[in-house]
Every structure is written in structure tokens, then in C-alpha cells.
């Protein structure tokens, strides 16, 4: 359209109560409460739940706006309105979603990529060559959720999500921690049967870790993996820690292998519990040399006599932020925003 017509149309829209955000020869971007649309273009705004595939390849539904008997979904007919000679119609905005890339970024510092660098650093290749890939092993992770990143699809990794009480949105991992940790698991055991128990979380903290762990136990897995804990340096155990201690012991007595993080500089609990496998961290430099990570914890427990942490080690970065392993996370998640390359 000619500039004069665009300007005249924008002024008419403003006069009718619309906010005009941008003007151009093809379209004018506007916004207003639903009742303004319904008044100017005699119609009703309705909602429709439409099946979609979000960026994580997760089938779900999204709420779209439209009008009854629309010739095209989301099109408001301008005929019969004061704008009938100025615009062809109104196209209602639709929700769009971030699409993650299968290819990781390439930061200009020494780092490891999943799965190959982790597999090599942990020396898992000989096991894979023998056909030991986690097939038939049921692992439950208790964490912030699992986002179906295209990385997992491209490598054939499969997982499912179970919500703990209070957790919502099984297709999302708003924090990103659980999704990233699962990539480490798949690097070592690509054929493992993964279930993620999404615990209710607030920022970087799990709100109901006891309930989430109990949910994991109820699924009767072979292994429960938890990369979290709190700082318990000296006895006595807090009331919370005593409850957690009891349910961890119960899980082990049921024949479940329980793995907990040794901590990131603190005296992690349940990571120091005597019944768990406590996982610490070593740093592998670019020449392949290994050294104890100054980011991961190592200590002798003051609560459980003769208990030294950790029992085993994975690969972990160094202080100050341990930015070391390139992991897939949900775009826009807390980990993506604060730790992204």
C-alpha cells in the first residue's frame, strides 16, 4: 500500500482504540483488549485448542484465538466495519516456540561435548564395544524435568516424564538442570530406560525433594540418580534430613541402587549417606590429564563415622563456574540463560 493509505489506516485504527506498534506497506501491527476487536469488527473472539509439536518434539496442544465461522483460521473479516475500505482483514497472532538446534555452539575455550567426549573421558567405549549400553536398565532421575531437545532425537535417546505432586508442564524443563544431566547419562548408557521425575522447583531449588524421591522409589527402578542435595556439615541431622535418610535407606533395602552427588563445594546430604553411591568429579584437561576438580566436593563425613566422599567420579569443570560440558537444555531455561555458551 502507498504510504498515505498506510498512515490513514493507522490513524483510523488508533481512533478506534487500537495500539499501533508498527506500520508498513504489507501490514500494520496492532493490539487491543478483545472487546475492542469485537466492537470494531462485529464478531466474537473465541479460543481453540489445537494439536501442535513444540520445539522439544513433544506432542501437545496450544491455545489459539479465532472467530466463529472464520474463512481462514485466525482471520477476522473487516467487511461491515469502519475499516472495510482500508484493510483486507485482521490476522490474529499465533503462539510460536523456541526451536533448539541439534548442533551445539562452539565456544572459544576448552570444553567437552556429549556424547563422544564424555564417553571417551569416562572410558565407556570398551563397554559399548562389548554390547553393554544400558539396555534393559531402568533409571529414574529426580530433577527439574526433561525437555525433549532435538539432540536426544538425533541420537535415538528415549525418555519419559512423571510429575511429582505440585509439578506441572511435563514437556518443559524451565530450569534446564535435569535435561542437561540426562545427556551425561545417555553418553555412558545410550540404551538406558530413562524416567525423569519432575520435582516442583523454585529457581534452582527443588521444593519437595522427599516427595519426588518417594515417587521415584514407587516406580521400582534399578537405579535412582539425583544430582542435588543440601549442606549438612555437622550432627545432628535436621528433621528433613532424617526423613530423607530413612527413605534413602528404604530404597536401598528394596534393591535399588541410589546415586547422589557429592556436592559442589559443600558437605552434601544425602551424598554422604553411607547407603548411597556418592559421585564426585575430576577435571580432564585438553591433553587428557586428570585432576581432582576444585568445584566438586571431597570430604570425610562428620555425621557418618568412617564415611569418605566421594565413591566414584565423573567429569566436572573447575572454579569459578565449572562451565565445561556442552549440554542440551531447553532454550530460555535458567541454565541456558545463566550458563549458556
Regions found by a protein language model. Give the residues of each.
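Inhibitory N-terminal propeptides of secreted protease zymogens
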Residues: 1-94
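Active-site alpha-helical elements of protease catalytic centers
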Residues: 137, 142, 155-156, 163-198, ...
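Active-site-proximal beta-strand/loop segments in catalytic clefts of secreted hydrolases
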Residues: 23, 31-33, 142-145, 197-202, ...
Amino acid at each position: 500500500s502507498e504510504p498515505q493509505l498506510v498512515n490513514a489506516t493507522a490513524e483510523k485504527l488508533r481512533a478506534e482504540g487500537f495500539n499501533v506498534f508498527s506500520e508498513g506497506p504489507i501490514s500494520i501491527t496492532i493490539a487491543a483488549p478483545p472487546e475492542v476487536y469485537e466492537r470494531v469488527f462485529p464478531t466474537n473472539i473465541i479460543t481453540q485448542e489445537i494439536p501442535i509439536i513444540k520445539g522439544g518434539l513433544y506432542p501437545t496442544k496450544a491455545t489459539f484465538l479465532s472467530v466463529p465461522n472464520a474463512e481462514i483460521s485466525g482471520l477476522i473479516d473487516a467487511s461491515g466495519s469502519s475499516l472495510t475500505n482500508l484493510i483486507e482483514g485482521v490476522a490474529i497472532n499465533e503462539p510460536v516456540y523456541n526451536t533448539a538446534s541439534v548442533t551445539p555452539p562452539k565456544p572459544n575455550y576448552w570444553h567437552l561435548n556429549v556424547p563422544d567426549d564424555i564417553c571417551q573421558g569416562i572410558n565407556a567405549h570398551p563397554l559399548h564395544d562389548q554390547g553393554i549400553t544400558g539396555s534393559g536398565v531402568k533409571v529414574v532421575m529426580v530433577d527439574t524435568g526433561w525437555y525433549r531437545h532435538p539432540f536426544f532425537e538425533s541420537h535415538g535417546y528415549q525418555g519419559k516424564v512423571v510429575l511429582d505432586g505440585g509439578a506441572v508442564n511435563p514437556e518443559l524443563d524451565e530450569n534446564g538442570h535435569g535435561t542437561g544431566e540426562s545427556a551425561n547419562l545417555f553418553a555412558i548408557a545410550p540404551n538406558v530406560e530413562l524416567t525423569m521425575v519432575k520435582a516442583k522447583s523454585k529457581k534452582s531449588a527443588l521444593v519437595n525433594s522427599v516427595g519426588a524421591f518417594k515417587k521415584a522409589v514407587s516406580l521400582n527402578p534399578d537405579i535412582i540418580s539425583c544430582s542435588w542435595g543440601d549442606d549438612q556439615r555437622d550432627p545432628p541431622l535436621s528433621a528433613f534430613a532424617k526423613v530423607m535418610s530413612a527413605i534413602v535407606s528404604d530404597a536401598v533395602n528394596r534393591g535399588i541402587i541410589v546415586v547422589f552427588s557429592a556436592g559442589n563445594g559443600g558437605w552434601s546430604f544425602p551424598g554422604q549417606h553411607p547407603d548411597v553411591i556418592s559421585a564426585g568429579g575430576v577435571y580432564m584437561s585438553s591433553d587428557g590429564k586428570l585432576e581432582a576438580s576444585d568445584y566438586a566436593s571431597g570430604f570425610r563425613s562428620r555425621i557418618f563415622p568412617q564415611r569418605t566422599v566421594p565413591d566414584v567420579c565423573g567429569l566436572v569443570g573447575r572454579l569459578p563456574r565449572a562451565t565445561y560440558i556442552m549440554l542440551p537444555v531447553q532454550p530460555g531455561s535458567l541454565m541456558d540463560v545463566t550458563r549458556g555458551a
